[in-house]
A protein has these predicted regions:
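Polar low-complexity intrinsically disordered regions
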Residues: 1, 15-21
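Sec-dependent signal peptide recognition
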Residues: 2-8
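Bacterial N-terminal signal peptides
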Residues: 8-16
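A sequence-level/structural motif corresponding to short, flexible coil/turn segments enriched
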Residues: 21-395
Length: 395
């Protein structure tokens, strides 16, 4: 009798359509074009302040910022620096709606650059900033009100060419990360400024081949810096050709932890990190290129992760969104792009994929993914001719 009951139970499980149903694939919706804001050679990126879009970059070798509305109508335009050459390369918006922009300018005339006293960590094969900006040795921060008024400009002179890559802000100030060139190659750096824009001590990360691509400011005063490295960092050796790195820096500016993400005979880079430690990056092994999207805990333990065929660089926003240029099918999506196509994915708190939306073909790179209270979720892309902003909200 027990055997018959067991067989009956097993049979009911085997033939239950609900128990054995394959998970439903996610449909991919179209992203809607909001507006285009300039050309790729003049636009570094876009952030949102209230209902305005803040476009920043360099035009005619001069750093600038300007605001447009969702139709592309210009609201204000501000030249940030009067030097012969200057660049604006990263931006963030604080809770008041003020815009903090990071870039680089030449050293003040007659100023002797200080000898850096870095906190060495070791680097990755970062490209040295090009010779055309060879005299840009001052890390520069600009703060602008939402109405386009320049509140302050401050600089941190260094002894090498610098290329800021990201900035994070909170009520206590700002943190800028980037790449600095030297005779060995390149290193990453972290520069912090207080709420008045006054810089503190520069922290150098590595010495010959490291990048610092994104930064998170934590409430305890510590920092998380992510990027890549192909050298030993704080005793942690390289496992692949280049590893993605997650670096903990204390309030006292000491490197306290390094976590490496590697691929055998491959290259990994963490391109972005949200404040919730949702990281986006690229994985390159031979001719295979993928986007990696991983949610980490506060101790840098991965809680969930995905890989998708792509052109590489991946941008994250909040705890739920990631965007990249997709190049292939995924078993989770009703999706089979014939050409590289922008793709925005959304996840729930447990890491389940909950939604997807795509932009038009012809886009070469995702410059950013933004979450705006007023404008919703935005994706910034660049094509050969224009930088465009897309939204999930139909217009």
């Amino acid at each position: 009798m027990k055997r018959l009951l067991s067989l009956a139970v097993i049979a009911s499980l085997l033939f239950s359509p609900l128990a054995q149903a394959a998970p439903k694939k996610i449909s991919v919706k179209p992203l809607q074009l909001l507006t285009s804001v300039g050309t790729p050679d003049e636009v570094s990126g876009v952030v949102a302040s209230g209902s305005s879009l803040i476009v920043f970059g360099s035009k005619a070798s001069k750093a600038y910022a300007r605001a447009v509305d969702t139709t592309g109508k210009e609201l204000w335009n501000l030249s940030l620096d009067q030097s012969a050459v200057s660049i604006a390369t990263a931006a963030a918006v604080d809770q008041a709606g003020d815009i903090w922009i990071a870039g680089a300018t030449p050293l003040a005339l007659g100023l002797i650059a200080p000898t850096p006293s870095p906190t060495p960590l070791n680097p990755d094969n970062a490209a040295v900033p090009p010779a055309t900006i060879g005299n840009l040795q001052a890390i520069t921060i600009w703060k602008i009100s939402a109405t386009g008024v320049l509140a302050f400009t401050n600089t941190l002179p260094t002894s090498s060419v610098v290329l800021p890559t990201a900035i994070a802000v909170d009520r206590n100030g700002a943190s800028i990360v980037g790449i600095t060139g030297n005779e060995k190659g390149s290193a990453g750096f972290l520069a912090n400024a207080d709420k008045a824009g006054t810089f503190g001590t520069l922290v150098q990360i590595g010495s010959a081949s490291t990048t610092a691509d994104s930064v998170v400011r934590h409430t305890d005063g510590s920092f998380t810096v992510v990027g890549s490295s192909s050298e030993t960092l704080s005793g942690k050796k390289v496992a692949g050709i280049t590893d993605g790195v997650i670096i903990k820096i204390s309030k006292g500016l000491k490197i306290t932890n390094v976590v490496r993400s590697s691929a055998v005979k491959g290259k990994r880079v963490w391109n972005s990190s949200s404040s919730t430690l949702l990281l986006g990056g690229e994985v390159i092994v031979g001719k295979k290129i993928e986007s990696a999207i991983t949610k980490f805990s506060s101790s840098y333990a991965p809680t969930w992760t995905y890989r998708f065929p792509s052109t590489g660089p991946t941008r994250t926003a909040g705890s739920t969104y990631a965007a990249f240029i997709s190049t292939g099918v995924s078993p989770l999506l009703n999706w089979n792009p014939k050409s590289p196509t922008p793709l925005l994915l959304s996840f729930d708190a447990k890491g389940a994929l909950t939604g997807a939306a795509s932009g038009p073909v012809g886009q070469k790179e995702v410059l950013g993914a933004l979450i705006s209270k007023e404008l919703g979720v935005l994706v910034v892309t660049s094509s050969a001719a224009a930088v465009s902003i897309f939204t999930l909200i139909p217009r």
